[in-house]
């Protein structure tokens, strides 16, 4: 009886028919994928993309040169140099991030006491040369200026969980 059952299954190719029916059932369902460059999926406010340095509304940069982000970076991708100003506060003279080393862990953003360094919503920052991935202070401030509205909205949305 067992041999007859096995022969009947082999003759009628039950597994093949079951697999084909599953394939055909998926063929008529709505697509689960999106057409990326033309359609965008929603992004979480916690998305960690391209780095940016933020400014206060009066235009002054937020970074107070505490160097916590440099100390906490596991990839050693951040380099900061600072000088005291006339009023006694410190400000950065050099703020570099080597994006080839960065692992996008977000520890720099968590360590910053004034929300100066953030990982913004930009995920499309490909470069043609390696040198373009070495971000200096001017590039980071320009990123912050470009994405400030969205960065502020993301930080506000994430505020209850911080």
From Swiss-Prot:
According to its UniProt record, this protein's enzyme class is: translocase
Which note does the record give on the cofactor? Binds 2 [4Fe-4S] clusters per subunit.
List keywords of the entry alphabetically: 4Fe-4S, Cell inner membrane, Cell membrane, Iron, Iron-sulfur, Membrane, Metal-binding, NAD, Quinone, Repeat, Translocase, Ubiquinone
* Listed Pfam families: Fer4_7
User: Per the record, what are the reactions this protein catalyses?
Assistant: a quinone + NADH + 5 H(+)(in) = a quinol + NAD(+) + 4 H(+)(out)
- Describe its membrane topology: Peripheral membrane protein
Q: Which cofactor does it need?
A: [4Fe-4S] cluster
- Kindly list the positions annotated as binding [4Fe-4S] cluster 1: 63, 66, 69, 112
Q: Name one GO biological process term.
A: aerobic respiration
Q: Which family does it belong to?
A: Belongs to the complex I 23 kDa subunit family.
The protein's matches in NCBIfam families, at most eight in alphabetical order, are given as: NuoI, PRK05888.1-4, PRK05888.1-5
What the protein does comes down to: NDH-1 shuttles electrons from NADH, via FMN and iron-sulfur (Fe-S) centers, to quinones in the respiratory chain. The immediate electron acceptor for the enzyme in this species is believed to be ubiquinone. Couples the redox reaction to proton translocation (for every two electrons transferred, four hydrogen ions are translocated across the cytoplasmic membrane), and thus conserves the redox energy in a proton gradient.
Query: Subunit structure, briefly?
Result: NDH-1 is composed of 14 different subunits. Subunits NuoA, H, J, K, L, M, N constitute the membrane sector of the complex.
Under which name does UniProt file this protein?
A: NADH-quinone oxidoreductase subunit I
Instruction: Name the gene.
Output: nuoI
């Amino acid at each position: 009886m067992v041999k007859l059952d096995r022969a009947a299954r082999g003759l009628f190719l039950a597994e093949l028919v079951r697999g084909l029916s599953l394939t055909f059932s998926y063929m008529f369902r709505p697509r689960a994928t999106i057409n990326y460059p033309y359609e965008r999926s929603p992004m979480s406010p916690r998305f960690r993309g391209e780095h940016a340095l933020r400014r206060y509304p009066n235009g002054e940069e937020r970074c107070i040169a505490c160097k916590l982000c440099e100390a906490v970076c596991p990839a050693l991708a951040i380099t900061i140099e600072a000088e005291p100003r006339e009023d006694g506060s410190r400000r950065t003279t050099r703020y570099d991030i080597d994006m080839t080393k960065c692992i996008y862990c977000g520890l720099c953003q968590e360590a910053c006491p004034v929300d100066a360094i953030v990982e913004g919503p930009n995920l499309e920052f490909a470069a043609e040369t390696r040198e373009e991935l070495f971000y200096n202070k001017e590039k980071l401030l320009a990123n912050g200026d470009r994405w400030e509205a969205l960065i502020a909205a993301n930080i506000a949305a994430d505020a209850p969980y911080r």
